[in-house]
């Protein structure tokens, strides 16, 4: 009986060791978004999805129209300019834009479309990032952030698609 208990415990520990990192990566993570005045305007959720990392955005209080939205390279969001978030997340050193043949940055997304009531509810999937701690991982040392810009992203111009000022930001953290 004791031999069985030790064997069972060994199997459990082996499975936990083998599945542990994947289990940690598989968790949904909520990103609290704030505007340039430091007020909360909504949230985003990242989660593993078939083909990459899913991003679900739910925000209010923005100007109607299209807005650039990107993962940025630093896990800081200091209002009002959010310059502390650094540039776009770009571990491969590519050019900006989904329509750029020399791109895109790992942090690039299609535009976020805000309705006439100032709210946006959108979902995207990025095959260029992971929920790991290195390489293309959003949980790497120094962190990352999600930034919404004032203007539409033209999807081709370096470094940020002419998407204008940073109007909302959220730190990506577990």
Per-region residue spans from a language model:
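N-terminal leader/targeting pre-sequences
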Residues: 14-66, 71-174
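Bacterial N-terminal signal peptides that target proteins for export
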Residues: 1-11
């Amino acid at each position: 009986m004791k031999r069985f208990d030790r064997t069972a415990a060994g199997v459990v520990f082996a499975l936990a060791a083998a599945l542990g990192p994947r289990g940690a990566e598989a968790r949904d993570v909520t990103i609290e978004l704030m505007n340039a005045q430091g007020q909360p305007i909504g949230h985003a959720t990242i989660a593993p999805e078939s083909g990459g990392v899913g991003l679900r955005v739910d925000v209010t209080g923005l100007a109607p129209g299209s807005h650039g939205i990107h993962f940025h390279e630093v896990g800081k969001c200091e209002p009002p300019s959010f310059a502390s978030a650094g540039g776009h997340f770009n571990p491969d050193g590519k050019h900006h834009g989904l329509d750029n043949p020399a791109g895109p940055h790992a942090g690039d997304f299609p535009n976020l479309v805000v309705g006439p009531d100032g709210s946006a509810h959108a979902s995207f999937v990025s095959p260029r990032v992971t929920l790991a701690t290195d390489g293309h991982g959003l949980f790497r040392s120094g962190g990352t952030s999600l930034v919404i810009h004032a203007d539409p992203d033209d999807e081709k111009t370096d470094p940020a698609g002419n998407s204008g000022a940073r109007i909302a930001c959220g730190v990506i953290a577990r």
